[in-house]
Regions:
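A short acidic, Gly/Pro-enriched loop at the edge of an enzyme's catalytic core
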Residues: 98-108
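A short, conserved alpha-helix within the catalytic core of class I
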Residues: 118-125
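Hydrophobic adenine-recognition pocket in adenosine-nucleotide-binding enzymes
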Residues: 114
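Class I SAM-dependent methyltransferase Rossmann-like catalytic core
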Residues: 3-28
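Conserved alpha-helix/loop element of class I SAM-dependent methyltransferases that forms part
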Residues: 25-42, 59
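A short beta-strand submotif of the Rossmann-like class I SAM-dependent methyltransferase core
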Residues: 111
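Class I SAM-dependent methyltransferase SAM/SAH-binding core
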Residues: 47, 52-99
Length: 125
């Protein structure tokens, strides 16, 4: 696990769009139920790493309200730019293998189906 290349690295943008749509359909309900248990409040600053099509970033934006902020980060944010996201969502290009993340500035840092694609030596040096 984590040793193989990213499963969708060579997928076309349209195929990746469809793959991520399937993930949303399968996992968004349980994901938002679990996140809701955290008690996310208005004004929170949230970071979603590997935001894909932005469904969870969109949901988080509703939780944090207009005074909160959600950063939807992905190493290839083209798919994020294809969807309409609330004004309190900022799209950012981020590769967690090569770029540092200032996690202290966030109340919540979240990822789903991401860490399995990170090489183990990065997770456990």
């Amino acid at each position: 696990m984590g040793e193989r290349p990213y499963v969708a690295a060579d997928a076309t943008e349209d195929l990746e769009w469809e793959r991520l749509e399937l993930l949303q359909t399968l996992y968004d309900t349980s994901t938002t139920q679990q996140l809701a248990r955290l008690g996310i409040r208005a004004g929170w600053q949230c970071l979603e790493v590997g935001a894909g099509r932005g469904s969870i970033a969109h949901w988080l934006a509703g939780c944090v309200g207009p005074v909160g902020r959600v950063v939807a980060a992905d190493m290839d944010p083209r798919l994020l730019r294809r969807v309409s996201l609330p004004s309190n969502v900022e799209i950012r290009t981020l590769n967690i293998l090569t770029q540092a993340v200032e996690v202290q500035q966030y109340d919540l840092v979240y990822c789903r189906a991401l860490l399995m694609n990170v090489p183990q030596p990065v997770l456990y040096p």
